[in-house]
Protein backbone atom coordinates (compact mmCIF):
# COMPACT_ATOMS: atom_id res chain seq x y z
CA UNK A 1 0.00 0.00 0.00
CA UNK A 2 1.15 3.51 -0.67
CA UNK A 3 0.37 7.02 0.51
CA UNK A 4 0.21 10.06 -1.77
CA UNK A 5 -0.74 13.58 -0.73
CA UNK A 6 -0.70 17.02 -2.34
CA UNK A 7 -0.03 20.12 -0.27
CA UNK A 8 -1.18 23.32 -1.97
CA UNK A 9 0.21 26.65 -0.83
CA UNK A 10 -1.57 29.69 -2.30
CA UNK A 11 0.37 32.21 -0.20
CA UNK A 12 3.97 33.03 0.73
CA UNK A 13 6.55 30.34 1.47
CA UNK A 14 6.03 28.49 4.72
CA UNK A 15 6.81 25.30 6.59
CA UNK A 16 4.08 22.90 7.67
CA UNK A 17 4.11 19.94 10.03
CA UNK A 18 1.82 17.01 9.24
CA UNK A 19 0.69 14.54 11.90
CA UNK A 20 0.68 11.09 10.32
CA UNK A 21 0.66 9.09 13.56
CA UNK A 22 -2.79 7.63 12.89
CA UNK A 23 -2.25 6.70 9.24
CA UNK A 24 -2.58 2.94 8.86
CA UNK A 25 -2.88 0.49 6.02
CA UNK A 26 -6.35 -0.88 5.47
CA UNK A 27 -5.38 -4.52 5.77
CA UNK A 28 -3.16 -5.06 8.78
CA UNK A 29 -3.04 -1.81 10.74
CA UNK A 30 0.69 -1.17 10.32
CA UNK A 31 1.87 2.42 9.76
CA UNK A 32 1.43 3.53 6.14
CA UNK A 33 4.74 5.35 5.84
CA UNK A 34 6.93 2.31 5.26
CA UNK A 35 9.53 4.43 3.45
CA UNK A 36 10.34 8.13 3.05
CA UNK A 37 7.92 10.19 0.97
CA UNK A 38 9.33 11.21 -2.41
CA UNK A 39 8.91 14.98 -2.86
CA UNK A 40 8.03 16.68 -6.15
CA UNK A 41 7.44 20.44 -6.17
CA UNK A 42 5.54 22.49 -8.75
CA UNK A 43 6.01 26.25 -8.39
CA UNK A 44 3.78 28.74 -10.23
CA UNK A 45 6.73 31.14 -10.65
CA UNK A 46 9.01 28.39 -11.99
CA UNK A 47 7.00 25.79 -13.92
CA UNK A 48 8.83 22.51 -14.57
CA UNK A 49 9.15 22.66 -18.35
CA UNK A 50 11.56 20.93 -20.67
CA UNK A 51 11.61 20.59 -24.41
CA UNK A 52 10.71 16.90 -24.26
CA UNK A 53 7.82 17.05 -21.74
CA UNK A 54 9.61 14.63 -19.45
CA UNK A 55 8.46 14.25 -15.88
CA UNK A 56 10.36 16.50 -13.55
CA UNK A 57 12.81 14.90 -11.16
CA UNK A 58 11.93 14.49 -7.51
CA UNK A 59 13.44 17.09 -5.21
CA UNK A 60 14.37 14.73 -2.41
CA UNK A 61 12.46 12.85 0.24
CA UNK A 62 10.68 13.61 3.49
CA UNK A 63 10.89 11.21 6.44
CA UNK A 64 8.36 10.94 9.24
CA UNK A 65 9.85 10.89 12.73
CA UNK A 66 7.73 10.27 15.81
CA UNK A 67 4.54 10.24 13.74
CA UNK A 68 5.07 13.65 12.10
CA UNK A 69 6.90 15.14 9.16
CA UNK A 70 7.76 18.70 8.25
CA UNK A 71 7.73 20.10 4.72
CA UNK A 72 8.91 23.46 3.36
CA UNK A 73 6.35 24.79 0.87
CA UNK A 74 7.54 27.40 -1.65
CA UNK A 75 5.25 30.36 -2.35
CA UNK A 76 2.32 29.60 -4.66
CA UNK A 77 3.18 25.95 -5.12
CA UNK A 78 1.95 22.40 -4.97
CA UNK A 79 4.12 19.84 -3.24
CA UNK A 80 3.32 16.23 -4.08
CA UNK A 81 4.49 13.55 -1.64
CA UNK A 82 4.25 9.80 -2.26
CA UNK A 83 5.51 6.44 -1.05
CA UNK A 84 4.52 4.94 -4.43
CA UNK A 85 8.01 4.54 -5.85
CA UNK A 86 10.95 2.22 -5.95
CA UNK A 87 14.32 3.95 -5.78
CA UNK A 88 16.45 2.02 -8.26
CA UNK A 89 18.41 2.35 -11.46
CA UNK A 90 16.73 0.83 -14.53
CA UNK A 91 18.86 -1.56 -16.59
CA UNK A 92 21.20 -0.13 -19.21
CA UNK A 93 19.90 0.01 -22.78
CA UNK A 94 21.92 -2.20 -25.09
CA UNK A 95 22.60 -2.46 -28.79
CA UNK A 96 22.84 1.29 -29.41
CA UNK A 97 23.88 1.72 -33.04
CA UNK A 98 24.02 4.59 -35.54
CA UNK A 99 23.53 3.48 -39.12
CA UNK A 100 22.49 5.58 -42.12
CA UNK A 101 21.32 8.51 -40.01
CA UNK A 102 19.15 6.32 -37.78
CA UNK A 103 19.98 5.59 -34.17
CA UNK A 104 18.55 2.29 -32.94
CA UNK A 105 18.74 0.20 -29.79
CA UNK A 106 17.46 -2.98 -28.18
CA UNK A 107 14.11 -2.69 -26.41
CA UNK A 108 14.34 -2.41 -22.63
CA UNK A 109 13.28 -5.46 -20.67
CA UNK A 110 13.09 -3.52 -17.41
CA UNK A 111 9.98 -4.49 -15.43
CA UNK A 112 8.62 -0.94 -15.17
CA UNK A 113 10.10 0.65 -18.31
CA UNK A 114 8.03 3.55 -19.74
CA UNK A 115 10.12 5.46 -22.30
CA UNK A 116 13.66 6.40 -23.41
CA UNK A 117 15.71 9.56 -23.19
CA UNK A 118 18.22 10.01 -26.00
CA UNK A 119 21.43 12.02 -25.53
CA UNK A 120 24.07 13.27 -27.99
CA UNK A 121 27.38 14.35 -26.47
CA UNK A 122 25.75 14.36 -23.02
CA UNK A 123 22.84 16.65 -24.00
CA UNK A 124 19.30 15.30 -24.21
CA UNK A 125 17.97 15.49 -27.78
CA UNK A 126 14.74 13.45 -27.52
CA UNK A 127 12.30 11.39 -25.50
CA UNK A 128 10.56 8.51 -27.22
CA UNK A 129 8.77 5.21 -26.70
CA UNK A 130 10.26 3.87 -29.96
CA UNK A 131 13.51 1.91 -30.33
CA UNK A 132 14.83 4.02 -33.18
CA UNK A 133 15.29 7.69 -33.90
CA UNK A 134 16.16 9.57 -37.09
CA UNK A 135 19.14 11.74 -36.14
CA UNK A 136 19.76 12.95 -39.71
CA UNK A 137 23.31 11.67 -39.68
CA UNK A 138 24.42 13.99 -36.88
CA UNK A 139 27.73 12.73 -35.57
CA UNK A 140 28.42 12.49 -31.87
CA UNK A 141 28.54 10.21 -28.88
CA UNK A 142 25.01 8.84 -28.39
CA UNK A 143 23.49 7.35 -25.27
CA UNK A 144 20.00 5.99 -24.65
CA UNK A 145 18.59 5.73 -21.13
CA UNK A 146 15.53 3.83 -19.94
CA UNK A 147 13.09 5.75 -17.73
CA UNK A 148 10.77 3.75 -15.49
CA UNK A 149 7.31 4.48 -14.07
CA UNK A 150 8.86 6.07 -10.96
CA UNK A 151 10.95 8.47 -13.11
CA UNK A 152 14.21 6.68 -12.34
CA UNK A 153 16.68 7.07 -15.22
CA UNK A 154 19.01 4.25 -16.28
CA UNK A 155 22.72 4.49 -16.81
Give the label of every model feature segment.
Residues 1-42, 76-80, 110-111, 151:
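Carbohydrate-binding surface patches
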Residues 26-74:
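Acidic, Ser/Thr/Pro-rich beta/coil linker or hinge segments at domain junctions
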Residues 67-69, 79, 131-133:
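Short strand-edge motifs at loop-to-beta-strand transitions and within beta-strands
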Residues 78, 113, 139-141:
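Extracellular Ig-like/FN3 beta-sandwich strand-entry sites
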Residues 85-111, 149-155:
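Pro/Thr/Ser/Gly-rich low-complexity, intrinsically disordered linker/stalk tracts
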Residues 108-121:
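Solvent-exposed loop/turn segments flanking beta-strands in beta-repeat/beta-sandwich domains
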Residues 123-130:
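Short beta-strand segments within Ig-like beta-sandwich modules, predominantly Fibronectin type-III
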Residues 134-153:
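Beta-strand-rich modules
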Amino acid sequence: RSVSIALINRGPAKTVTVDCSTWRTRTDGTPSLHQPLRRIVYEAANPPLNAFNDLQAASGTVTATGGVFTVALPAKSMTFLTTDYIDRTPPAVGGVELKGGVLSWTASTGPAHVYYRVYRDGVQIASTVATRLDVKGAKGDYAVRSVDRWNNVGR
